[in-house]
């Protein structure tokens, strides 16, 4: 039986480690840091972990706001989206995630483009 992306990322624990690292990178990223200043980072990490777990095929239920609502009024640029994805790639590589899984996550994140850019 083929493992789900959720399982291949290390289930909830592995995904939480990826998200924790990625959000820390966002907060330190010169381009993204202003977006994270003053935010409740532990809450952002929790919600992003649930979202990513569900999106990767895990049993968790994300009951937060949809991506368009979360990003409404932020006027996020494509450059910021790419920087966000780059931070996730670096976090996954740091966690030892394989190239196939990294590519799958990148495709999922990029598929959200219409929900987060310039909304």
Language model features with spans:
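Core of compact, soluble alpha-helical bundle domains
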Residues: 1-119
């Amino acid at each position: 039986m083929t493992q789900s992306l959720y399982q291949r990322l290390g289930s909830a624990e592995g995904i939480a480690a990826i998200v924790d690292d990625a959000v820390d990178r966002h907060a330190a990223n010169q381009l993204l840091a202003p977006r994270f200043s003053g935010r409740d980072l532990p809450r952002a990490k929790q919600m992003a972990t649930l979202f990513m777990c569900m999106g990767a095929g895990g049993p968790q239920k994300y009951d937060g706001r949809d991506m368009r609502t979360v990003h409404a009024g932020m006027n996020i640029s494509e450059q910021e989206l790419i920087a966000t994805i780059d931070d996730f790639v670096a976090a996954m590589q740091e966690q030892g995630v394989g190239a196939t899984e990294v590519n799958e996550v990148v495709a999922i994140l990029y598929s959200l483009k219409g929900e987060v850019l310039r909304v």
